[in-house]
């Protein structure tokens, strides 16, 4: 009986050790793959369009403000037939950023 118990403990120990090593190998492979993906993403990233600049060429290229990404807003100027698109911050997000800044200054 002692032999079976000793053999069982040894088997469980070896199994847990081998599974831990396999998990470490998988984690290392995942980390390497993630780093290579991040490097590729940074290399492919392009310049963002600053606030109040024309974004009609790429409507998803607006820069981020402190908390939120600016939105490409298109409109027709008064008396004009051409559509104009610029990166702007919606007013409700502007107010939220101001409130967050005040709270940060109050508690930070």
Swiss-Prot record:
UniProt keyword terms in alphabetical order: Disulfide bond, Knottin, Secreted, Signal, Toxin
Propeptide segments, given as residue ranges: 21-44
Extent of the signal sequence: 1-20
PROSITE patterns recorded: SPIDER_CSTX
GO annotations of cellular component type: extracellular region
Subcellular location: Secreted
MF GO annotations: toxin activity
Known tissue expression: Expressed by the venom gland.
Bridged cysteine pairs (disulfide): 48-63, 55-72, 62-87, 74-85
Matches recorded under Pfam families: Toxin_35
Domain-level remarks: The presence of a 'disulfide through disulfide knot' structurally defines this protein as a knottin.
Recorded family membership: Belongs to the neurotoxin 19 (CSTX) family. 01 subfamily.
Protein name: U3-lycotoxin-Ls1w
């Amino acid at each position: 009986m002692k032999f079976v118990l000793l053999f069982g403990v040894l088997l469980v120990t070896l199994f847990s050790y081998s599974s831990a090593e396999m998990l470490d190998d998988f984690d290392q492979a995942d980390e390497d793959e993630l780093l290579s993906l991040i490097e590729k993403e940074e290399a492919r990233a392009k310049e963002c369009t600053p606030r109040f600049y024309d974004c009609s060429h790429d409507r998803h290229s607006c820069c981020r403000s402190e908390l939120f990404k600016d939105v490409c807003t298109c409109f027709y100027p008064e008396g004009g037939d051409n559509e104009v698109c610029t990166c702007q911050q919606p007013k409700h997000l502007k107010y939220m950023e101001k409130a967050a800044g005040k709270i940060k200054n109050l508690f930070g």
